[in-house]
Every structure is written in structure tokens, then in C-alpha cells.
Amino acid sequence: MSSTLLIVVIVVVTALAFDFTNGFHDSANAMATSVATGALKPKVAVIIAAVLNVIGACLSTEVAKTISGGIVNDHLVTAPMVFAGLIGAIIWNLATWLFGLPSSSSHALFGGLIGAVLVEAGMSGIDAGKIMSKIILPALVAPFVAGIASLLATWLAY
């Protein structure tokens, strides 16, 4: 087996490990309320979460589009950088899960990849404007938009 093929296999296995941590990390966040209130039994919640994660992975490509949409310079990204980014995201997912902290696996993946590219290629490896417009600004604006939407929905309902 050539060294390039070995690196690709290692990156793919690491991506599957990230996907596993993404599943148990984010699924727990999504299903906790249903299980805690008794609306769903834990086994049913796990089955629903698994099925919906598979469907979501098949139907949604927005995270992949964002990553490939120019936030990092594609020509500078190498398999070891992707591996380092995945390892960083896995460690972050496990740490936040261990301490019971809410976090986004997608943002962990963005952070891991951006960090790996910064270390290897420096500022020339990233597009700060796209990072601001595609990741940071939406993360800052979304809570306010959700708050206003919920306020309006509450006013309309009562």
C-alpha cells in the first residue's frame, strides 16, 4: 500500500470517527428533552435519532458546501491538514460531551480545519471575509433572530 493511499484511508477512518462523535454529541442534544419529559423512551429516541442522522447526512450538504466554498484555500489543503482538523474537532466534541457543554460539531469541524490551515499555511490559507460572513456572523446573529421570531410567535399566539 502506497503512503498516499494509507494517508487517505487514515483520513477516511478519522472522518468516520468524527461522524460518530457528531452523532452521539448532537443527537443527545436533540433528544434529551423528549426523553426527560417521558415523551419518548430512550430506545425509541436512539432509533429516531439514528434514522434522522442518516437521512440528514444523505440530504444535507450545506456543511460540505461551506467548507469547500472558499473559507480555506483549497490548493493549500493537504490530507494531513484534514486529518489534523478532524482530530481537533473530535477532541473538542469529546471534551464538551465529557463536561456537558453544548457545542456544535459543525463549528468544531470548521475550527479544526481553519486552525490546521492557519498553522500550516498562515493567513494566506484562509479567507477571513468568508469566515466572517459564512460562520461568525451567522453564529452571532442567529440567537437574536430566533429571539425576535419567538417573541413575535408568542405575541401572535396570546
Regions found by a protein language model. Give the residues of each.
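Alpha-helical transmembrane segments and immediately membrane-proximal extracytoplasmic
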Residues: 1-158
